[in-house]
Amino acid sequence: MPIKIPDDLPATSVLEAEGVMVMREADAVRQDIRPLRIGLLNLMPNKVTTETQIARLLGATPLQVELTLVRMTNHVARHTPADHMLSFYCPWEEVNDQRFDGFVITGAPVERLPFEEVTYWDEMRRVFDWTQSHVHRTLNICWAAQAAVYHFHGMKKYDLPAKASGVFRQRSLVPASPYLRGFSDDFAIPVSRWTEVRKSDIPADSGLKVLVDSTETGLCLLDDPRHRSLHMFNHVEYDTTSLADEYFRDIQVQPEAKVPVNYFPGDDAKRPPENRWRSHAHLLFGNWINEMYQSTPYDIERIGKV
């Protein structure tokens, strides 16, 4: 099934060119089914790139998805045109009376700050609490995953001695998990972060389950059944060139920045990288949506009440 997004969203032409089925508003109303309502709280600097990445993965599943783009209420995006934000994004305070089958919260370029020093931290805490009454399934990515386990479980984040940047091998630890259906035992995922949360800090009574980790970069994916959440600490959604874009940006201000590990062929930044994680990105999002579809109420107003 296709993904339903605003007709004029820049992602529309990109996804259609890739063969992703995009549904126009007029076409959607003719289908006699309830689409899954999924919100995307986009905290990344380049909103257009990130919304396209997430829409690509949501739109590849067999179910009709209606995507709502959400921003923090009072935070002003500095790297995305104001008219784009005004046209396509809703402040969280304008949607917090609505219910969603799924909600995705992205990473943010604030991970080196203590959580309490992030300007929108108070609202972020309210968002996390709101997901418990208005969202059926939540997927937190990178900084949002760190923030969620700090908010719900008191797990601290730690500075790394150097930025973890590259494509690192990961291990599937719970093959029977519905979220890992179809996963290889060993696979690669992009990592791009300055901080980490540690397996040793997981509270014994938290109910958290480590689904995926790495001997090099630690925790990758946690299942949090009590909060109906998945916490993905890495960037499975990244495009082929995302790490390259970050690297070339970084060396403009930090010439000694290291080349992302296991990314460019032969670690030669002049050679185009190859994507080795695309299939597992689609598997994760497909499995997450399937689990959501199997258990979400048909009457969306019952979300949070059953």
Curated annotation (Swiss-Prot):
Recorded catalytic activity of this chain's protein: L-homoserine + acetyl-CoA = O-acetyl-L-homoserine + CoA
Main location: cytoplasm
Active site: 142 (acyl-thioester intermediate), 235 (proton acceptor), 237
Site residues (Important for acyl-CoA specificity), renumbered to this chain: 111
InterPro entries assigned to the protein according to its UniProt record, in alphabetical order: Class_I_gatase-like, HST_MetA, MetA_family
Subcellular location per the Swiss-Prot or TrEMBL entry: Cytoplasm
Pathway the protein contributes to: Amino-acid biosynthesis; L-methionine biosynthesis via de novo pathway; O-acetyl-L-homoserine from L-homoserine: step 1/1
Enzyme class: transferase
GO molecular function: homoserine O-acetyltransferase activity; homoserine O-succinyltransferase activity
One annotated Gene Ontology cellular component of this protein: cytoplasm
Chain positions of site Important for substrate specificity: 192
Pfam families: HTS
List of residues binding substrate: 163, 192, 249
BP GO annotations: L-methionine biosynthetic process from homoserine via O-succinyl-L-homoserine and cystathionine
Known EC number: 2.3.1.31
Alphabetized UniProt keyword annotations: Acyltransferase, Amino-acid biosynthesis, Cytoplasm, Methionine biosynthesis, Transferase
Annotated family: Belongs to the MetA family.
Reported function: Transfers an acetyl group from acetyl-CoA to L-homoserine, forming acetyl-L-homoserine.
Protein name listed in UniProt: Homoserine O-acetyltransferase
Organism for this UniProt entry: Brucella canis (strain ATCC 23365 / NCTC 10854 / RM-666)
